[in-house]
Amino acid sequence: MKASELRNYTDEELRNLLEEKKRQLMELRFQLAMGQLKNTSLIKLTKRDIARIKTILRERELGIRR
């Protein structure tokens, strides 16, 4: 998901999406441990999405506009 797309979301929607991505990451890690995960790059992509969401939320807290 692109940062420009995420900037259109409200803070509440971003927080909900953040929780969803964290749950998804946990499930992916379980699948990896069980040997069921075939596409391991999904872990990397999910972690990057989490970082993007956290960055946008922090920018809004500090009043930084992009």
Swiss-Prot record:
GO molecular function, one term: structural constituent of ribosome
Record keywords, A-Z: Ribonucleoprotein, Ribosomal protein
GO cellular component terms, A-Z: cytosolic large ribosomal subunit
One GO process term, biological-process aspect: translation
PROSITE patterns tied to this protein: RIBOSOMAL_L29
InterPro entries (UniProt xref): Ribosomal_protein_uL29, Ribosomal_uL29, Ribosomal_uL29_CS, Ribosomal_uL29_sf
Residue ranges the record marks as coiled coil: none
The family this protein is said to belong to: Belongs to the universal ribosomal protein uL29 family.
Protein name in UniProt: Large ribosomal subunit protein uL29
Organism of origin: Thermotoga neapolitana (strain ATCC 49049 / DSM 4359 / NBRC 107923 / NS-E)
